[in-house]
């Protein structure tokens, strides 16, 4: 197993480009299953564990793929299976994205219930509701979702999501683009990753109106085609790198971004006393002499993202005063708190919110990652902690950050990856 060894106390300074977004790449890769026509070329695909797992899943289904220098090529003309097996799906919850496109293309599919980060309930009920609304019969048997179209193809319908869901919106889009008639999605997710998926599907030949709003109108088409496409940037990675500068008293410019997609995070940084400027496709953050405490509540886009909640908590351990952190999306996403407290933080969990007492001097020790963003949180804490911090189980980190230790090293961090043996 790998661990990251961090000697804290180094300022994070310099210029670094943002990687492509994992959260948009995965549904885009799934959408290639919609058509046998041609070869897709998806640029700016991040080289991550989750992406590699998804490529493995496509290969299992019979797709031909090549992946080099962040360019992914996919051809799904000769698929040999419509079943997504447990052995691959268990590794990440995003595997559920194959449900919609396989059902739309073949009329039936069998997908194992997904895995991924272990925090709080993440039911597949909304995905099943979407497929049933579109005219499929869905059952769950022996850990598999079995879905079959009643008739020759899915049928357009009106779907009003009870809550905003990125995953269910993505699956609804992919399932409905070739459905007969018109589908209306109300309370659709607003996240940039959904807008990116819409743009990808439109380039393939789909007809989607209302892109960038909570109401999407999809007129089904008979066929789609393979295309070339460039993925968007990873706004969570960008926010994490900005946090690294803020927590260490440094200054960083992150390039190849769309600053407007970071608006809520940049506003929070400004409230904390950081100087934040944008210039075209770049964001520059310079840390203040003292950080102000800033309360945040994680909600669906365009509000503060749940995927930045843990990193913000690490930052607030260094603020001069107390701050509160609430997560309205995943109420139990606080697995990082005990590990932060091991480093010397003083954080209390009160019902479904956390109270961070700052500032606290952190001291390096061994800490264990429990999920993707908790891993990033602990790395940030290690950057400012005295002495040496060892972050164990960084396979979680590798699911969503592309060579993060190399990027941080380029910005001045003393961080290295080492092998270790974990006792059972």
From Swiss-Prot:
InterPro entries: Enolpyruvate_Tfrase_dom, Enolpyruvate_Tfrase_sf, MurA_subfamily, RNA3'P_cycl/enolpyr_Trfase_a/b, UDP_GlcNAc_COvinyl_MurA. Disulfide bonds: none annotated. The modification 2-(S-cysteinyl)pyruvic acid O-phosphothioketal is found at residue 117. The active site is at 117 (proton donor). Pfam families: EPSP_synthase. Its main location: cytoplasm. Belongs to the EPSP synthase family. MurA subfamily. This is UDP-N-acetylglucosamine 1-carboxyvinyltransferase.
């Amino acid at each position: 197993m790998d661990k990251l060894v961090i000697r804290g106390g180094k300022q994070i300074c310099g210029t670094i480009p943002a990687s492509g977004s994992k959260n948009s790449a995965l549904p885009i890769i799934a959408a290639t299953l919609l058509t046998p026509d041609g070869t897709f070329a998806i640029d700016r695909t991040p080289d991550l564990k989750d992406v590699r797992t998804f490529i493995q899943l496509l290969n299992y289904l019979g797709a031909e793929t090549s992946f080099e220098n962040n360019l992914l090529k996919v051809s799904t003309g000769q698929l040999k299976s419509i079943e997504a097996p447990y052995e691959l799906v268990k590794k990440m919850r995003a595997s559920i994205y194959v449900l919609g496109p396989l059902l739309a293309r073949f009329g039936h599919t069998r997908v194992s219930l997904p895995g991924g980060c272990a925090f709080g309930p993440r039911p597949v009920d909304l995905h099943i509701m979407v497929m049933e609304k579109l005219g499929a019969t869905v059952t769950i048997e022996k850990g598999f979702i079995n879905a079959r179209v009643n008739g020759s193809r899915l049928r357009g319908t009106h779907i009003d999501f009870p809550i905003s869901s990125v995953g269910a919106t993505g699956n609804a889009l992919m399932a409905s683009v070739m459905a007969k008639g018109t589908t209306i999605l109300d309370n659709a997710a607003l996240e940039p990753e959904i807008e990116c998926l819409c743009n990808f599907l439109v380039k393939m030949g789909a007809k989607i109106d209302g892109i960038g709003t909570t109401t999407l109108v999809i007129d089904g088409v008979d066929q789609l085609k393979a295309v070339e496409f460039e993925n968007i940037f990873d706004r969570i990675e960008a926010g994490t790198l900005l946090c690294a500068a803020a927590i260490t008293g440094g200054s960083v410019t992150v390039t190849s971004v769309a600053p407007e997609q970071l608006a809520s995070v940049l506003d929070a940084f400004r409230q904390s006393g950081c100087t934040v400027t944008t210039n075209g496709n770049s964001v520059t953050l310079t840390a203040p002499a003292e950080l102000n405490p800033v309360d945040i509540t994680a909600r669906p886009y365009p509000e503060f993202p749940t995927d930045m909640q843990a990193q913000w908590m690490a930052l607030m351990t260094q603020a001069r005063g107390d701050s509160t952190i609430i997560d309205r999306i995943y109420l139990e996403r606080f697995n990082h708190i005990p590990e932060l407290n091991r480093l010397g933080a003083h954080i209390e969990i009160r019902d479904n919110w956390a109270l961070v007492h700052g500032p606290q001097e952190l001291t390096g020790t061994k800490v264990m990652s429990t999920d993707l963003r908790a891993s990033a949180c602990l790395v940030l804490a290690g950057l400012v902690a005295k002495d040496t911090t060892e972050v164990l189980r960084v396979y979680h980190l590798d699911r969503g950050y592309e060579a993060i230790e190399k990027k941080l090293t380029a910005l001045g961090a003393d961080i290295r990856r080492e092998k270790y043996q974990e006792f059972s």
